């Protein structure tokens, strides 16, 4: 039997997690024939995800039913599929239908997105505010990797879905003297836009994978698996136009949290950079979006060049939003998301998958630049996975895989 049938994708792993730790954890479920942590081909730094191959493929069923924590970090596990299998699934219409068929299922989450955070807010203050709604299991404030400046947004995880419902009784909260916006964070497979139409590769559609164009999954907590819930069904470009491989923790390419125009301008990111800023009233073009045009002032009294619901919100203004994360001050969470955007626009760069142009998986679709026959244009990039032959199982919730090929931007 082909050993690749027992292949598991593991995302959101700590930078400190190596192959030995990966193998040690999953050996509890069965014999591990191979464990791989993907690394940046230029810097050698871990990319925050990897793969495990079990000798007995039947082990995967049990692994996928449980939650996993390695080096105190909750990781995301999905069945890996070959490109051929992915394409067959796409042709037969089985792309995540059980997970994106509508109804209330996609609203069920224990995580929220919080935008417009004060720049001086600490993790502890962040946690204390939301603990009044229920026990908090994790918090993360996003930072710019290059400057260590807070990006103005973060995530809070509760131990119950009811706590999220309580928080969302109002959209705006007063936190440390500043009004912040709260939204439900959803797994990218939960597509409120309806069905599998939004999951194709390329264009501006699909919940397509974590990733950016260069460094990769350097986010420090599992919130990199989530994106904001929104009611617009147009495109939802999602976690990465460039695949899982790069979106976490590379430079600031001006993209970020959203293809919706995002919370920031076109070149800086959430509160960082000359043309962006999540409410920097003295910055022209700041606010929610990067697309041009006059927009109403946002909740932070910021002249937004695009604005929530204005041009760019849910449209092709994919390269904007919350930019990059990165190292954080010692007292705060070092987590962060990709240089190209987390969520609506996706964690991802504009031109590659695992740092290339095909990447790990446009569901049944082709990558935007280069195909699977181009060297380094697909797959897991490095370590024998550069042939673009594998993707994540869409039925496991990755929507279009880890790459959108150019749509989204998407994490």
Swiss-Prot record:
SUPFAM superfamilies: RNA-binding domain, RBD. Residues 6-82, 110-187 form the RRM domain. Residues 81-103, 183-221, 358-411 are annotated as: Disordered. Residues 192-212, 362-387, 397-411 have a biased composition (Gly residues). It comes from the Eukaryota. Residues 341-390 are annotated as: Nuclear targeting sequence (M9). InterPro entries: hnRNP, Nucleotide-bd_a/b_plait_sf, RBD_domain_sf, RRM_dom. It is found in: Nucleus; Cytoplasm. GO terms for molecular function: mRNA binding. Residues 87-101 have a biased composition (Polar residues). Keywords: Cytoplasm, mRNA processing, mRNA splicing, mRNA transport, Nucleus, Repeat, Ribonucleoprotein, RNA-binding, Spliceosome, Transport. One of its GO terms (biological process) is RNA splicing. Its main location: nucleus. GO terms for cellular component: cytosol; nucleus; spliceosomal complex. Pfam families: RRM_1 (PF00076). Component of the spliceosome. Interacts with TRN1. PANTHER family: HETEROGENEOUS NUCLEAR RIBONUCLEOPROTEIN 1 (PTHR48035), RNA-BINDING REGION RNP-1 DOMAIN-CONTAINING PROTEIN (PTHR48035:SF2). Involved with pre-mRNA processing. Forms complexes (ribonucleosomes) with at least 20 other different hnRNP and heterogeneous nuclear RNA in the nucleus. Involved in the packaging of pre-mRNA into hnRNP particles, transport of poly(A) mRNA from the nucleus to the cytoplasm and may modulate splice site selection. This is Heterogeneous nuclear ribonucleoprotein 1. It comes from Arabidopsis thaliana (Mouse-ear cress).
């Amino acid at each position: 039997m082909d050993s690749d049938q027992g292949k598991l994708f593991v995302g959101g792993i700590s930078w400190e997690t190596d192959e030995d730790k990966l193998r040690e954890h999953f050996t509890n479920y069965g014999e591990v024939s191979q464990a791989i942590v993907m690394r940046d081909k230029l810097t050698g730094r871990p990319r925050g995800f990897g793969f495990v191959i079990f000798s007995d493929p039947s082990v995967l069923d049990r692994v996928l039913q449980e939650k996993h924590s390695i080096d105190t970090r909750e990781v995301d596990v999905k069945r890996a599929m070959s490109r051929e299998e992915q394409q067959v699934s796409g042709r037969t219409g089985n792309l995540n239908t059980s997970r994106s068929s509508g109804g209330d299922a996609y609203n069920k989450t224990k995580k929220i997105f919080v935008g417009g955070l004060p720049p001086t807010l600490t993790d502890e203050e962040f946690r204390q505010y939301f603990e009044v709604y229920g026990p908090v299991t994790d918090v993360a404030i996003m930072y710019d990797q290059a400057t260590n400046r807070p990006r103005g947004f973060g995530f809070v995880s509760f131990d119950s879905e009811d706590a999220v419902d309580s928080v969302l009784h109002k959209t705006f909260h007063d936190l440390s003297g500043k009004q912040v916006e709260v939204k439900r964070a959803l797994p990218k497979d939960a597509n409120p836009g309806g069905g599998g139409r939004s999951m194709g590769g390329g264009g501006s559609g699909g919940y397509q994978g974590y990733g950016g164009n260069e460094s990769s999954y350097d986010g420090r907590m599992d919130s990199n698996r989530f994106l904001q819930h929104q009611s617009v069904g147009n495109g939802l470009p999602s976690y990465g136009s460039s695949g899982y491989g790069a979106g976490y923790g590379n430079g600031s390419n001006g993209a970020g949290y959203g293809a919706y125009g995002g919370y920031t301008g076109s070149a800086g990111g959430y509160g960082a950079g000359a043309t962006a800023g999540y409410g920097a009233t003295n910055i022209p073009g700041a606010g929610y979006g990067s697309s041009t045009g006059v927009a109403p002032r946002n909740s932070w009294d910021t002249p937004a060049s695009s604005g929530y619901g204005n041009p760019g919100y849910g449209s092709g203004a994919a390269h904007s939003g919350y930019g990059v994360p990165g190292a954080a001050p010692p007292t705060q969470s070092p987590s962060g998301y990709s240089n190209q955007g987390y969520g609506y626009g996706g964690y991802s760069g504009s031109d590659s998958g695992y740092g290339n142009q095909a990447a790990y998986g446009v569901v049944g679709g082709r990558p935007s630049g280069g195909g699977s026959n181009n060297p380094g244009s697909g797959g897991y990039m490095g370590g024998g996975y550069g042939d673009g032959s594998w993707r994540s199982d869409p039925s496991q919730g990755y929507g279009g895989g880890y790459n959108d090929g150019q749509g989204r931007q998407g994490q």
